[in-house]
Amino acid sequence: MTEQDLEIIQGTIAAIVYQNYDNGYAVLRVDVGAKQVVTVVGTIPLPAVGERLLVTGKWSTHASYGRQFEAEFLERLMPQTAMDILNYLSSRIIKGIGPKSAARIVEHFGDQTLIVIEREPERLAEVSGISPNRARIIGEEFRQRVGVRQLMEFFALHQLPAELAIRTYKLYGESTTDLLYDDPYLLMDPGLDAPFGAVDRFAIELGVSADDPRRVRAGILFELNYNLSAGHSFLPEDKLTVATAQLLSVETETVKEAIEHLLSARQLIRNTLAGITVDYLPALYEAEEYITQRLLQSAATTFPEPKHLNRLMKSAAKQSGLEYSQQQEQAIRAGATAGVLLVTGGPGTGKTTILKGLLSLLGEMQLKCVLAAPTGRAAKRLTEVTGEDASTIHRLLEASIEPASGEMVFLRDENNPLKADVVIVDEMSMVDVLLLHSLLKAIPMGKRLILVGDPDQLPPVGPGFPFGDMIRSEALPTVRLTEIFRQAQQSLIVMNAHRVNNGELPDLKNVKSDFFFLPCRSEEELRQTITGLCTTRLPQKMNIPADQIQILSPTRKGGAGTESLNQLLQSTLNPAGGGKRERQFGDYVFREGDRVMQIRNNYDIVWKKCDGSAVGTGMFNGDIGIIRSIDPHMETMTVVFEDREADYDFTQLNELEPAYAMTVHKSQGSEYRAVILSCWNGSPYLLSRSVLYTAITRARELLIIVGRAETVAAMTENAKRGRRYTGLKLRLQGKV
């Protein structure tokens, strides 16, 4: 198509039919005058009702939606008259301004309103009902919206995600475009989570050469940061060199020169482990070094055995109403004197009994204990089984956002340590090396640390595998629980978990217990079986309501994966209609009443207790909630997380995903009354023994595996764990 074939239309946005915050695509109804409203489609980031557009494009006819104007270029025309400005502001385009306040503002400033908001926002306080602080916030919101929108349009020209523009603007502010022209690879800041391929293409479009040192250095840092997500704390230097050279299509010598530059700038740390030269990001190197030092110091610290320990043990046992086995008594006694203690064991081996016993004994010793776990669900479960308050590690450390940088920081550290004599952490297999580093810094020297977990479950999502490394190092006091108690032996869930962990096939034929297998011949049969279990069989025949059932799958993709199952289960358990409001985001439609999950830590989301008793900040990866309401005018969605509720701006919906079904990895640290495991074909990396073992141990009363017996067998046989490059074990053993 030539420029002569393009047309130009001008009009006012009358309605927003659809908008995708991820890529900026929108479908608009635009009033072009003469009582004519047309449909305009294209990349139009953050449109607002009442906004005027000058659009260049072409007409087309959609098979389902009819005639529409496809936008290729657009110019936003700020409203000029007082009436147009009133309509524009009344659309709630700026948070803090509704129809009533818009009328008062426009009445006061007339056609100069937008100039005042942009250049002299403090003058808004001249309007009744607007405080100086609110005036400042309105000005910031307006400038940010204009800046983000301009950046989105700039990014759209270079095929960069619109959502990335929002995060980038928050980080770099009004100077973003100038900064990116100077160095496009600023987009590779880890906090932006930008795809390297898209950023690299963008940089080349701006004139960066293939062997530009900025590009090569960015490629090296990308490789290291990318491998953090695979669990690695470092990479061997030869592997890092080759991987970067292949990524960028440059010579290895060019990469080696860039590595030396990064080393001299302290952006990399070189180390030797087992005779191999390796490269760390500084934060990972410092974390391993500090953890090693603190744990070995704690291991060398033993506290005197309290007087009358036997009497205290009996008193603790009586208080908790429990009788200890020999292994359990050994663990509890060790907890009375050890500076650091590891307690490990599978399901049914009595870890909960030990936790209760330790708390009773340490209480008898007049020691203050704090309990923590990696996720909110794990912390809630810890509270339930011990009867004591427990929090997430992030909340224990008082995670907060540093205003100047926008980065997450912990307010509890070596300068503001925890006020506790003993810190007890459960579900340690989920804790990565960076989080453990932060935790140890907040524990004063001379205090006690008790770490409880099961290293045979899946390793942490983040870098390292500190709990597994600690146990395998044999350098720290450790109690291994191996005895399965008689009551636990009655549970096929427990016994099959141990069978799988030992490489034996689970019993799939027993139909009179808490563990069932339902074979399926096709993915469609699997999907229908799961639907029937959730809607009819479990609620009606076993009195287990749908909200107490969790679907798990090793995979995200495919008909048996979580993405497809979530769409199926939403349509079944929470269908459209009945006045329920919705919001499309990406490929998913969020609907009032949906079960959703927070998928990344966000330390500045404000929440409040549902009873209004408290307000706080921070929602964390793995938190599960229900969408209570969707407000299209305020562009917010309210989600209730058990006893708390939080409002999400529509631009934050990338932090949520449906949770009718979730991956086994996401379920770690949780326990559900009933678990249905979708077991079909998939990657050997995902269909592993540790994935199956972790899935089985998520069920409290009932586990149903739906799918192929061959897949269950393959998972049981696949004992391979993805290798993680981590130096903690060697450091603890003194082999560095």
Task: Give, region by region, the residue ranges found by the protein language model.
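Accessory alpha-helical DNA-binding modules that contact the DNA backbone or grooves
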Residues: 25-33, 39-40, 48-277, 344, ...
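Short aromatic-glycine-enriched beta-strand elements
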Residues: 19-30, 633-639
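Loop/turn positions that initiate beta-strands
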Residues: 50-52, 593, 622
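C-terminal accessory regions
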Residues: 502, 610, 621-736
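ASCE P-loop NTPase helicase motor core
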Residues: 329-332, 337-511
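Conserved helicase motor core of P-loop NTPases
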Residues: 351, 455-617
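Pre-P-loop entry segment of helicase/translocase ATPase cores
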Residues: 156, 215, 225-226, 270-330
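Structural detector for short beta-strands of small beta-barrel domains
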Residues: 5-20, 57, 624-628
